[in-house]
Amino acid sequence: NNNEDENENVSDSSNENRRFWEASVPGGHYMVALDRISNISIHEYALDGAVVVHEVTIDTNGRALARFYYLQPISETMNRNEVARVVDKGRQLIDRAGQRLGTNVADMVQKTYPATTHAGTIEYRLQDIRDLDALYGSLRKAWESGKGRKITIQ
């Protein structure tokens, strides 16, 4: 997909440092040498029957696996108004908790110890599926061309 043109939250450009692909996203910054990338993927899966995970992974010759993902409640894939209202109420509660803590909880990776705590995994959560598509497009373009790129997602 070439959605970066439609999404004003995304800036994707050639990187002055030609050896690297960089991503600045809410919640952090990731940088990898293009010659260290062994594979990239974009895929989706259902998690615990409640959430569809749209995910980009970057595997490297080092010890770290990078994951960029967007979470979509399964209710959004269905036409069920009642379920959607419950999900929206849950989101409001999470947002209010984050405001009290002074943190944007929506941008934070959600983990359950120890089931989702993986050594060597770097994770970033995105809030818009278009941002994930733009990120994958930038990554793929850099890896295929061997020319560094930098993407910034607001």
Positions of predicted regions on the chain:
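Eukaryotic intrinsically disordered, low-complexity regulatory linkers and tails enriched in Ser/Thr/Pro
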Residues: 1-154
